[in-house]
């Protein structure tokens, strides 16, 4: 069932021990497996107020969303419009898919070629290894799937409802940052948005390996449905904190593109997933991305970042991961004119 994580771990360990020249790129300071961190509950926002509330309640809700995006880069939403029945079915279907043998998963015909991923192909050291597996599924794979299985119908329901929630939140954030809220309907299309189903198997070396390496998301915003195992951590006030699972909430986090588009008003925060020695963890995420040719440009007369297309951003991230083993991200696009 599991990918050959131990084999990869042992190969990386052997390479580190026998390597005579230290040419492994240094990873930023936050890339270290730490001991105990404080567990906190993210801000919780009842987004039903955006639809059903009076004008004053809607404005309070919008401000709460913007404030959490400025101060945390992460928040939770309840009464979000995605039923617990859909979420539970999504989890059950996900578990069933990951229970298949590794060889079958890696050659799966359920999704397009290359959808199944595991570990960190670019890893040159143990600290760059992610002890997890995933199915990376473009929205078009879901909507174009004519094989009406329980999996495809459940994914379509989850994806379409996540998409609606993402548009609603993005338009609120655009309004509160003085940007054009119609940008998302015009530019965030199904062929670049995607779902990612994640599984984090039990790891025998939890003090040495991440479930998912520290990173920021290369999108506008992410909607995450996770189980109650825990393991998600993020940076707040220059320290790592653990996110306390909330069974009634979805987690929302700001991506790199929103940080650049809002001129740094909203924060794309570094986060990671820790491993667990005994219990597996499951999550499903929806990533809101623009078309590849969409230009990320803020309306400020003193932009912190230069204009760039989503295609250019992706290519730069891929080049950095290949060269260094980790993503550099937005610092590559800082505007040095000011």
UniProtKB/Swiss-Prot annotation:
Gene3D superfamilies: B-lactam Antibiotic, Isopenicillin N Synthase, Chain
Function of the molecule: Catalyzes the 2-beta-hydroxylation of gibberellins (GA) precursors, rendering them unable to be converted to active GAs. Hydroxylates the C20-GA GA12 and GA53, but is not active on C19-GAs, like GA1, GA4, GA9 and GA20.
PROSITE patterns noted in UniProt: FE2OG_OXY
Domain Fe2OG dioxygenase residues, every copy: 191-290
Protein name: Gibberellin 2-beta-dioxygenase 8
Record carries keyword Oxidoreductase: yes
A single Gene Ontology CC term: nucleus
UniProt cofactor note: Binds 1 Fe(2+) ion per subunit.
Underlying gene: GA2OX8
EC code: 1.14.11.13
The keyword Membrane appears for this protein: no
Family annotation (InterPro entries): DIOX_N, IPNS-like_FE2OG_OXY, IPNS-like_sf, Iron_ascorbate_oxido_reductase, Oxoglu/Fe-dep_dioxygenase_dom
Coiled coil: none
A single GO molecular function term of this UniProt record: gibberellin 2-beta-dioxygenase activity
Catalytic activity as recorded in UniProt: gibberellin A1 + 2-oxoglutarate + O2 = gibberellin A8 + succinate + CO2
């Amino acid at each position: 069932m599991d990918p050959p994580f131990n084999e990869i771990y042992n190969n990386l360990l052997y390479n580190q021990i026998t390597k005579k020249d230290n040419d492994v790129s240094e990873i930023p300071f936050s890339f270290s497996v730490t001991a105990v961190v404080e567990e906190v509950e993210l801000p919780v926002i009842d987004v039903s107020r955006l639809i059903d509330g009076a004008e004053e309640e809607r404005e309070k809700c919008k401000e709460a969303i913007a404030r959490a995006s400025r101060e945390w880069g992460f928040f939770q939403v309840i009464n979000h419009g995605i039923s617990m029945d859909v979420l539970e079915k999504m989890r059950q279907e996900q578990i069933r898919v990951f229970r298949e043998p590794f060889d079958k998963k890696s050659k799966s015909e359920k999704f397009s070629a290359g959808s199944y991923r595991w570990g960190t192909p670019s890893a040159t050291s143990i600290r760059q290894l992610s002890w997890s597996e995933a199915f990376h599924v473009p929205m078009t794979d879901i909507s174009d799937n004519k094989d009406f299985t329980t999996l495809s119908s459940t994914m379509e329901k989850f994806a379409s409802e996540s998409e609606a929630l993402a548009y609603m939140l993005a338009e609120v954030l655009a309004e509160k940052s003085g940007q054009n809220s119609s940008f998302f309907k015009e530019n965030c299309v199904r062929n670049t948005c995607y779902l990612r189903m994640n599984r984090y198997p039990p790891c025998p070396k939890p003090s040495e390996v991440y479930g998912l390496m520290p990173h920021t998301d290369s999108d506008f915003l992410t909607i995450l449905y996770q189980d109650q195992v825990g393991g998600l951590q993020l940076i707040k006030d220059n320290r790592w904190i653990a996110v306390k699972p909330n069974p009634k909430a979805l987690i929302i986090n700001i991506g790199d593109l929103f940080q650049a588009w809002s001129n740094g008003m909203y924060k794309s925060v570094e986060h990671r997933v820790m491993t667990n020695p005994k219990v597996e963890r499951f999550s499903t995420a929806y990533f809101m991305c623009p078309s590849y040719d969409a230009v990320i440009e803020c309306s400020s007369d003193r932009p912190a970042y230069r204009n760039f297309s989503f295609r250019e951003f992706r290519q730069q991230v891929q080049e950095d991961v290949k060269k260094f083993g980790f993503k550099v991200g937005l610092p590559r696009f800082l505007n040095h004119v000011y």
